[in-house]
């Protein structure tokens, strides 16, 4: 059972006062039977270990002394129930991760859910219960809620945008919380979106800085094609375009050269108008010009209010950094059964 810090940790060499414990991140793929059975699994990553991210979150909360408040107020042998309560409407996400955290803190805790990841919850709904040692439930509480509230907020916004964007697919970006890339992108999947590239390693994405450094769109594409051929890499290639002229340049290159290009980003071709509406005529022209030869991705000025109109242009994907970089957490709480706690407290003369 979890008490202070049951994790492999090292004392930071420059700590002057109380030692700060640092958990080293592992480059081992997560192996978890609960994950393998999930309907919506976390996206794959070659160096990201989900278990160690959970351990890091617990370790930073526990510090070097553990939960001093729990030690002072909760009997170590106290058993209780605690209920998950939705305090606003939304899409719940992070249920599977919450189970893993509870199991990491105390494998004897029993967790029961009345909904699944991706289900709609309404304000006032009790949607889950955890039973067992009250001390360990409270230790896990904040870490569980931090993950669930953030993931549920992402899933809720993703669901709204994915529904509005249809028939286009909604994507997130790499604008995620540091260290939580996989968790954020997992929440997008739970909300009904699709994942963009995980990082710098799994897709070539030629953006404005690459184009400027290479000397133009055509030269950048040629360099990428040569690099992939020389290194025998087969991965997706996307190029950013900002004007119709750049779209034409990409299409001209592709018509004359065998290329690995798979997707064209149409960046900031959605123009905001003074009346609050948007002009999508440039985006629509670009999509018609490409004419299905490559997948297309609209980026820039994408909001919940604009995404439907963008989705009607025929674009394949719509990407939005707002799904993860400025998400509003869904308000969820975990409350111990007061009557049961008081009854136990009376028996132990602590109430």
From Swiss-Prot:
Enzyme class, spelled out: transferase
Keyword check for Transit peptide: yes
Pfam families with a match to the protein in the record: QRPTase_C, QRPTase_N
CDD domains: QPRTase (cd01572)
Catalytic activity as recorded in UniProt: nicotinate beta-D-ribonucleotide + CO2 + diphosphate = quinolinate + 5-phospho-alpha-D-ribose 1-diphosphate + 2 H(+)
Any Gene Ontology CC annotation: mitochondrion
Pathway(s) it belongs to: Alkaloid biosynthesis; nicotine biosynthesis; Cofactor biosynthesis; NAD(+) biosynthesis; nicotinate D-ribonucleotide from quinolinate: step 1/1
Compartments where located: Mitochondrion
EC number: 2.4.2.19
Principal localisation: mitochondrion
UniProt keyword annotations, A-Z: Alkaloid metabolism, Glycosyltransferase, Mitochondrion, Pyridine nucleotide biosynthesis, Transferase, Transit peptide
Binding-site residues for substrate, renumbered to this chain: 142, 173-175, 197, 207, 240, 267, 299-301, 320-322
Induction: Induced by wounding.
Any GO MF annotation of the entry: nicotinate-nucleotide diphosphorylase (carboxylating) activity
GO BP: alkaloid metabolic process; NAD biosynthetic process; nicotine biosynthetic process; quinolinate catabolic process; response to wounding
Keyword Repeat: no
NCBIfam families referenced in this protein's UniProt entry, alphabetically: nadC (TIGR00078)
Role description: Involved in the biosynthesis of pyridine alkaloid natural products, leading mainly to the production of anabasine, anatabine, nicotine and nornicotine, effective deterrents against herbivores with antiparasitic and pesticide properties (neurotoxins); nornicotine serves as the precursor in the synthesis of the carcinogen compound N'-nitrosonornicotine (NNN). Involved in the catabolism of quinolinic acid (QA).
Family: Belongs to the NadC/ModD family.
Protein name: Quinolinate phosphoribosyltransferase [decarboxylating] 2, mitochondrial
Organism whose genome encodes this protein: Nicotiana glauca (Glaucous tobacco)
Gene designation per UniProt: QPT2
